[in-house]
Regions:
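Basic, glycine/lysine-rich polyanion-binding surfaces/domains
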Residues: 1-191
Length: 191
């Protein structure tokens, strides 16, 4: 089945921009076929549902093994898991949410996940994003819904290196990837 699945970015990524010293100033990659589940849940909010941790603090991420849960709103989360995990996760979460008003949806094909890493990753994002991405304000484990180059994205900082994951609608992924590559060009010169 894998040979029938395609990404809109398969001919663009991975991509890296070397600085004058030869080390990558910024690199772009794609997390292909990551499973994504949307969860809407009415209060009271549990700390876990179906064994999946729910961050209750705004704009935070909870991690348990390979499952990441991003807080998107007071009653909304995005759960990501490795390829093939959705049927089991959907079952667990749906069963756990059966006694409360909830919506559990497989969103796996709706967004592409672009990974941005390297010493200039933050500077690249700051070119098109109005969020304060300074390390005091946006740290590993932070996430936010925002605009990047005018497109709605979900931004998830995964490490202090820094590295980020950008969740973008599948239909806009190629345009955003082209924008990122073009915007990164200035970082070819070390400085």
């Amino acid at each position: 089945m894998d040979e029938t699945r395609h990404s809109p970015l398969e001919d663009l990524l991975p991509w890296a921009l070397p600085a004058e010293d030869g080390n990558p100033a910024v690199s772009l990659g794609e997390l292909r076929f990551v499973q994504q589940i949307g969860l809407r849940l009415r209060p009271p909010m549990p700390a876990y549902i179906g064994g999946v941790p729910l961050p209750l603090q705004p704009n935070r991420v909870a991690v348990m093994r390979a499952v990441r849960t991003l807080w998107l709103g007071p009653d909304e989360w995005l759960i990501t898991a490795p390829d093939g995990a959705v049927p089991e996760l959907l079952s667990w979460i749906s069963h756990a949410a059966a006694d409360r008003r909830a919506q559990v949806t497989d969103l796996s094909a709706s967004r592409v996940i672009i990974e941005i890493a390297g010493p200039r990753a933050r500077a690249l994002l700051e070119k098109g994003c109005g969020l304060d991405l300074h390390p005091r304000a946006f740290t590993p484990g932070s996430c936010a819904q925002t605009l990047l180059a005018g497109l709605p994205v979900i931004l998830d900082q995964t490490s202090a290196a820094p590295s980020y994951r950008l969740f973008v609608r599948r239909s806009a992924a190629r345009w955003l990837c082209d924008w990122l590559i073009d915007a990164a060009e200035e970082f070819r010169v070390a400085g």
